[in-house]
Amino acid sequence: MTNFLKYILIVFLITGCQSLNNIGNNIGSTIGFIEEDPFAPTKIQTDYENFLKSNWIKRNTNSFKFSELGKKRPAKNLFFASSGDRLFSIFDNLEVIDITTGETLKEVSINESVMSGVAAGYGVFVYVGENGEIFVNNIESGENRWSAKLNDQVLSPALITSRYILVQTSSDVLYVFNLSDGETVWSKKAQPSLLSIRGTSSPMLYEGLVFTSFSNGRLSANRITDGIQLWERPISVIKGSTELEKLKDSDSQAIAFEESVYAANFNGSLTRFNIRDGEKIFSVDLSTSKPLLMWRDTLLSSNTDDEIIQFDAINGNEKWRNSSFKYRKISNLVIHDGNLLFGDYEGYIHKLNLQNGEILGISKSKLNSIKNIAVISNDLIIQDDLGSIEVLSIF
């Protein structure tokens, strides 16, 4: 009897082990078939030629605080500006920097966080504090020329012209100020969207008309002198039924050429309008919150999946699409010497052929995730998500 029980126990243990082994194999098989994250950043090849040389770098030591979990909070300011050989950016204070050497030429004390970044031109630099007050300072002396309370946040840089300063608030109010004395020339309030979770665009001036895109997904054309509205049109139509699908924020500044103006929005379209009456000439699918670029008779944009697309500016047809950088959180696009340049979340800077989208070069910067880039002559200025700046020579 005892031997029989031992036999039963041995059979049970063997069977149990086999069952556990099968379960393990099944789990392993299941794990083997788990799909990769479809939104994981695309891996890139780094064996292309280098085309940049670092000139100088300035770290933003006041760009973050430590949260309770010990994580870095990104800098609020992600916009710098340039005027001549000077660079304007916000670190502990607003600094005026020599682009060639990186030397700080002047500091302007700032007592509050700046959400709008800084804009510069026509002898002044402009920024808006987090409490909604706009400051206009003299470029040479740094002294304040005038200020005005907007009572609302501004998330995008101001537009400076020879006579006016234009700012758009987060609640879709466009203000036009007199450059010299700060007098309000006119203002326009758009019908706000029921749902808006993104930023705001900057207004654009072309042939005496101010083109402004709003969170409700509409583009308006107003006369700069008196604010009279010539037309207002939707950039795209609502395609879904959920609130998120109805989100149509337009954070991209409009762009104009000859008798046409182009605008794009999130979850929407790239649309070409007639400047004079707002008639829609074409509309093609595009979801973006990044600036549009025009090159010859084409338009360039990156969509929300970080694909780079070139469109025919006449009929909207797609000329080429590069999907090699999907989900790499690429920066705005800039053009230099017939090539397209942009940065990504790992601090890489990429160069594409504008004719066909072919990858031509790659360079590694000393910064973190690159959010903003600009070209001045043969220099590339880049800024990362912590507000640090690096200037590189293009060769």
Each model region followed by its residue ranges:
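Short loop/turn segments that connect beta-strands within beta-propeller blades
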Residues: D98-G102, N138-G142, N178-G182, R223-G227, ...
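Loop/turn-rich, solvent-exposed surfaces of beta-rich toroidal or solenoidal domains
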Residues: S302-I309, N317-K351
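Blade-level signature of beta-propeller repeat domains, shared across WD40, Kelch, NHL, RCC1
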Residues: S365-F395
